[in-house]
Swiss-Prot record:
Keyword DNA-binding: no
Gene Ontology, cellular component aspect: cytoplasm
Reactions catalysed, as given in the entry: Hydrolysis of proteins in presence of ATP
Originating gene: lon
Naturally occurring in which organism (per UniProt): Wolbachia pipientis subsp. Culex pipiens (strain wPip)
Protein name, as recorded: Lon protease
Functional description taken from the UniProt entry: ATP-dependent serine protease that mediates the selective degradation of mutant and abnormal proteins as well as certain short-lived regulatory proteins. Required for cellular homeostasis and for survival from DNA damage and developmental changes induced by stress. Degrades polypeptides processively to yield small peptide fragments that are 5 to 10 amino acids long. Binds to DNA in a double-stranded, site-specific manner.
UniProtKB keywords: ATP-binding, Cytoplasm, Hydrolase, Nucleotide-binding, Protease, Serine protease, Stress response
Amino acid sequence: MSIGRAVNFNSTVLPVLPLRDVVIFPNIMLPLFVGREKSVHALEYAISSSSHQNEIFLIAQKDGSIDNPEPENLYEVGVLANIIQPLIKLPDNAVKVMIHGVRRGRVIEYISSHTLLQARVALDGHYEYGENEDNIDLEALRRSVIDAFDNWCKLSKKSRPEIIIDPIDQVKEVNQIVDMIASHLNIKVSDKQNILEVYNPKERLKKVFALIEREISILSAQNRLYKTIKSQVESTQKVYYLNEQLKAIQKELGEFENGDEGNILNEFEKKINETKLSEEAKEKAITDLKRYKKMNPISPEATVISSYLHWLLDLPWGKYKDAKINLNAAKKILDENHYGIEKVKDRIIEFLAVLKRVKEIKGPILCLVGPPGVGKTSLAKSMAKAVGRDFVRISLGGIRDESEIRGHRKTYIGSMPGKIIQHMKKANSCNPLFLLDEIDKMGSDSRGDPASALLEVLDTEHNKHFTDHYLEVEFDLSSVMFVATANSLNLPHPLRDRMEIIQLSGYTEDEKISIATHHLIPKLKKEHGLHQKEWEITNEALYELIRLYTRESGVRSMERELAKLMRKAVKAILTDKNKKISVETGNLQDYLGVRKYTFGIAENESLVGIVTGLAYTETGGDILMIESVLIPGKGEIKYTGKLGEVMQESIKAAYSYVRSNCLFFGIKPEKFQNNDIHLHVPEGAVPKDGPSAGSAVCTSIVSLMTNIPVNKSVAMTGEVTLRGRVLAIGGLREKLLAALRGSIKTVIIPSENEKDMQEIPANIKEEINVIFAENIDEVIKVALMHPITSIDDNNEISVSTSIENKDNTFPSSETLKH
């Protein structure tokens, strides 16, 4: 076997032909199609020039997408080639040329030219081969490469292996073998160029062997994948063919009608004939059933149609529950299940009375709005019981997709009707009482706005023609009695306009005691298996439980605490053999643990700049403390506590009013100019907004600047204008309940809210002294512990404004805390 050794000659200047996505090897003949202008000129120059004798230097581009490659876009090593046929002109101005690779060369430098690319090239000499018969490793490597290439040829199936392998077997020179094999491999240009640039024969064999093995692995994986796919396709075709044969056999034997498929078809036909479908729905059902009969039962489309027909035919078309309304019985049911809320129950009875007369629902949709735990959902259940209708409930909290209401179109995988149609099927009648729970908790995003989708559902003029996207036919919702619940009126205006709002306020302590005694305790005893005489709780203990372990407008927390007491009672009866458990104020803490809340006034002492305000939230009323401190500055006011825009504007308005009337309040203007006020509303992590804290902010600023403390037992609420007027507020009942829970004795409210006092329970009026104020001056007179001494324009004391002091105590300035 011969091993080549290259002999270098002197360099020469040659025209250069850049190649796209191809590498030419020595001793390889190949046709090329050349179209670039410079490349064509290079070929013509090589043929016409007597010095080059049809010689041209071929070199591969690093990036084949570049049309006009620069020297840095070309590899350094290429091949000197002979043009062995005349150029053949093609219609697109390109030329076809046949070239034959001669030997390798390395570019020394490129020579600039406008018409063609030339380079000075150092050419490798012809190989001189020496004998080395003892090189067993090289011979083994040569044979391995040829065998691997033979396997590659068989796997690639691009040509007969013997046509390629036989000529290679005849070649003895290692480098020529490598060149011939590399030219046939379907590998990347960079890999071929790498082989071209390696001179050591043994290294060249190793590189080409590794590339062949990689290509064999890829081809083997492709063949396995092809066989797998082919097998799957053949299996599917076989199943389809057998199913068609089975159908034909069943048809011949008359067994098709007795099979499962026949039963399903018979069931569909029977339902279509017996169900009181609308004309549109019946036509749709018949059309889809005809399509279904012609389909393969296991096909995906047949499954979709079958599911659709089940939904369409299982709806309560034309089914109405005979609901006879007895107003006396309805009132009795409402009174038994719900304590208080007389006005709400009266409105429901009025609604039922009209419904009894007209026999159809044309009035507004009722929307029960109130804090959690006041009985909105249970009230809707009682309404259903009172009118003798089926009750279904949809929880709308967190729904953001319009398709949850209207359904998904059948084109989607896993599509199904919306919640309205789903629950109509569940109700199994066309006139249930439908509760839309937590309607204010819906959201919206890119998938649509469910609140807008509800507009059609709640419109009594149009819901007769409600169309679900899945059903694609109209379904009559006009006989459905819709009731909605919400914690707040944070609803889109068009949706709110379709409903009549009924407010459910929080319960007083006396009402909670009555609810616990007559409703919760009997229910919980039954749930925990306690007999009537095995467990009892005193009224005093109930009051303490409400005050120290719950702080809510409703009764859910109270129910949880009572359930906790009864669980411990059951455990004590079974383990300690106690016959009776009695819960009193003395042992309440033993059962419920450490007190969760404090019951008493919001502040233990009357302090400067500390004012008790009142707030109204979705969960009811609450006490809102407002604090302020004075720091040296430039007359600015800062506020913290996660305040909303409306509340920030209210603070600015209150500050401007007090500063503009500083002399009246006995404050020198210099005190504002030389100091900043920092106003804070705890708790800092809870968002707060609204204008009703204006009077409390004014009082806090006046108290701070005059150094007069605010009465700890006084709370206030009201919006303040720049003229000092106190404007009306909302949520008065909830705010007064919060004041009562905080042991507030006096509450100052706007005079415009005096009319709302008729809605306030008598026990609240007895326990709280409610004072009406038209302007902020009246509020400050009641709230501050000391009289205000006004200053005239000359900064002289002129007026002493006396105020009524509820505690009849005026602490000395030395004892005031700030």
